[in-house]
Amino acid sequence: MKRKKKQWTKFRHRVIRNLAYAVLYPYTRIKYGARIEKFREKQKRQYLIAFNHQTAADQFIVGSAFKGAVYYVASEDILTNGFISRLLSWAVAPIPIKKQATDVSAVLNCKRVAKEGGTIALAPEGNRTYSGKTGYIKPAIVAFVRTLKLPLLLYRIEGGYGVQPRWSDEVRKGKLRGYVSRVVEPSEYQQMTDEQLLALIQKELYVDESQSIETFTGKNLAQYLERALYVCPKCGLTTLKSAGDEIACSCGETVRYLPNGKLQGENFPFSTVAEWYDYQCDFINGLDLNSLPNAPLYTDCGLRISSVQPYKRKTHLDMDGRAELYKDKIVLTIAGETTELTFETIDVATVLGRNKLNLYHQGKVYQIKGDKRFNALKYVNLCYRYKNAGKEGEDGKFLGL
């Protein structure tokens, strides 16, 4: 006889949400300057909430706009931290998913929550923006929406990147706004083609912070921008270093980050991080990998390398490891031994948080964390540039996030 599955949605989740709201709503207003517009609807029903991903507090912002519990689709990494993860699962029951991978179990769990009457929320980008522009949204979101058959609620967050860019540890003073952009009923999206529904989601969730006229004041405005950038418009692949409000390249190029989000430098070709980031993506997509030397393009030392057991735990393998990035592989040195991960055999490479690197390789998951200045993005971008060889269209330009 089959054992009956435990219910995913619990009454305690609503109680905990209400208690947390009393603390987190004023917290987000004070810390992030958030103006959260409450969603008021007479009908009490469940939704699939899709939001653009700008800050580490997006789930608090979204949750503050709605009554009742919201079940978030979140990175599996949040369930690998022992007691804290178990407490989180008990309190709010997030739905874990493998980043940038097809995760059937996550879809099944979402169907289960929907069947139980729960509201589900996710960021279709799958990653928090590094540039201030809404990132690539995979077409698979359309099939996901159609599978759940819930009213689709599109939620926009504006100003979050200005308040705290993904690459920064500092929170700046400015204005953040969260609001419902549109509600799409199942009867409406059932009449749309897949292309039309995808275009609608992309349009309603698209935000470009580089076009903002707001100012965001604070200390060390450019600090750790090198987590997001590793290509110099003058010398190409490079290592950048930030200090205070400035970021500099080893070639001597120096740029200042201003409170309005603009860049200031002598004859510097980009006025915003978004322009520089787009140039970096174009540069990588235009690289002729065959012309690159068979030597490390980058070497990072002093890395904490862990083995991750998805949804369960992580085990530290080396607190002083090394990673070498080649044109076609990543070589890890763990406890004195080398492990070669070719781009062909890496299933998924992704960035977690500000600068953690996860590599899914032949049934194993390696997590790599460096110092404050570590750039995980370059490993992901080069890996996908290799994998995209021969592909056309937007999929051929997708660099992992």
Stretch-by-stretch model annotation:
Residues 265-322:
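Anionic N-terminal interaction surfaces
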Residues 344-401:
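Acidic, Ser/Thr- and proline-rich intrinsically disordered linker/docking segments
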Residues 8-13, 17, 21, 26-197, ...:
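Soluble catalytic domains of membrane acyltransferases
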Residues 49, 97, 324-356:
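Phosphoinositide-dependent membrane-docking surfaces
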Residues 217-269:
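Cys/His-rich short segments
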Residues 183-184, 195-228:
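A conserved mid-domain beta-alpha-beta active-site/ligand-binding segment of alpha/beta enzyme cores
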Residues 247, 303-305, 328-333, 355-361:
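Short polybasic amphipathic segments
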Residues 88, 194-209, 375-390:
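Short amphipathic C-terminal alpha-helix that caps PH/PH-like domains
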